[in-house]
Amino acid sequence: QFNFLLAALSGAERIFDLMEQEPEIDEGTVTLCPVEVRMDGSLKEAEGYTGSFAWKDADSLTLLQGDVRFHQVVFGYTEEHKILDGISLFAKPGQKIAFVGSTGAGKTTIINLINRFYEIQSGTITYDGIDIRRIKKDDLRKSLSMVIQDTHLFTGTIADNIRWGKEDATNEEIEEALS
């Protein structure tokens, strides 16, 4: 019974820590929306799934392509200890890239910055030409795919694993995600 009590106290402590967390601040105004791409290349906001998405800012639409750029990015978990100092890099639309390096080289940090889990001290990170600080965090994170070092698959089919982030995904949406 004593072990049970210790486990319960440990669980309660984690719950209280979670409850004390400050809500994440999100001042982004640019959102992700499904679009129809017309024959002339223009975009029209769509009601349902179309397979194409765009960044919506006020009345303008910018097609989601996946162009990610770091320009002179400076970041450190503390002001005194910079992890990245003036880094510039880019990933072209559709390009698959891998960050390879020793432990502590900044691979996971770069992924965390793209997702805005942390804010950079200076420089810019753009996504399809839009400063990511202007994009709503939920929409930014929905638009990204990543495989981190410790990859875990769940029981079930490959489709079930892909559906993990969107349980109501249709087979068509899964096929689109795989292409």
Language model features with spans:
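ATP/adenylate-binding site constellation spanning eukaryotic-like Ser/Thr protein kinases
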Residues: 11, 21, 137, 141
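Conserved E/DxxT/N motif and adjacent residues on the DHp alpha2 helix
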Residues: 17, 24, 163
